[in-house]
Curated annotation (Swiss-Prot):
Belongs to the histone H1/H5 family. HCT subfamily. Keywords: DNA-binding, Repeat. The keyword Iron does not apply. Residues 100-125 have a biased composition (Basic residues). It comes from the Bacteria. It holds the Pfam family Hc1. This is Histone H1-like protein Hc1. Residues 98-125 are annotated as: Disordered. The lineage of its organism: Bacteria, Pseudomonadati, Chlamydiota, Chlamydiia, Chlamydiales. Might have a role analogous to that of eukaryotic histone proteins. One of its GO terms (molecular function) is DNA binding.
Length: 125
């Protein structure tokens, strides 16, 4: 079976299971039995689907379309944050600036150098 055929069978089975579940909730015993048998069929077809999808991935048949790839790239990029400005409140004492200050961004921790032990010469002869 091809991957598309297997996917089609799975969707058909899922739809019929859903319809029979609604009937089984109302008390239909035959529908409940159909749900049980169809769920077993679905398990078997799902196993086939997993195998076929792995083969398709290895062969390169399941590639993303160009539009989907562009959306994924756009979502991966993070927007650049602008520097935040904080305005000081005016005060009544002496001189107070009302200029906006740029809040500094956090810097990475400075790298520490690893100290190496000094080699000592032995005095034994």
């Amino acid at each position: 079976m091809a991957l598309k055929d297997t996917a089609k069978k799975m969707t058909d089975l899922l739809e019929s299971i859903q319809q029979n579940l609604l009937k089984a909730e109302k008390g239909n015993k035959a529908a409940a039995q159909r749900v049980r048998t169809e769920s077993i069929k679905l398990e078997k077809i799902a196993k086939v689907y997993r195998k076929e999808s792995i083969k398709a991935e290895k062969m390169g048949l399941m590639k993303k379309s160009k539009a989907a790839a562009k959306k994924a790239k756009a979502a991966a990029k993070k927007p650049v944050r602008a520097a935040k400005t904080v305005a000081k409140k005016a005060c009544t004492k002496r001189t107070c600036a009302t200029k906006a200050k740029v809040k500094p961004t956090k810097k990475a921790a400075p790298k520490t150098k690893v100290k190496t032990a000094k080699k000592t010469r032995s005095t034994k002869k």
